[in-house]
Amino acid sequence: MQEISDLSFFQDKGNVLILTGCSKNKLNTEQEVPAEELYTGTLFRFVKEYADSINADLYIISAKYGLISRNTLIKTYDKVLRTYADAESLRPEIERELSLLHGGYDQILVIAGDKYRRTLKGIADERYYFLKTSGIGHTLHLLKEQIS
């Protein structure tokens, strides 16, 4: 696993998977909707747009549902990874699900906070790249640069 501070490396780089955390801001609905429609936070929206721009698959680490694809039908919920202990309790499930999924990818880009990244610590290999920035504003700036 490597930390990176620039996203230009991922332009036209083969089969890429992007992992991101769920969003606190969600669509207010009682219906099941695709995860990509449920999460409405700014960072999530930019990560989704970036994934589309480089033709990458997008999966979400959800505090409630575990590892889900952007198309997984889910309902609104109120659960976040508040502590590292929360992340550790979710880690075995995330690692199990990723072990079935990540073999088909050349590179795996993680755009998520520390607690969400903690769920990957036992499975991240040399294909994993963790975007390391000075904060959410910097992350949004990097994503905007690549999208436009």
Regions found by a protein language model. Name each.
Residues 1-148:
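Peripheral peptide segments
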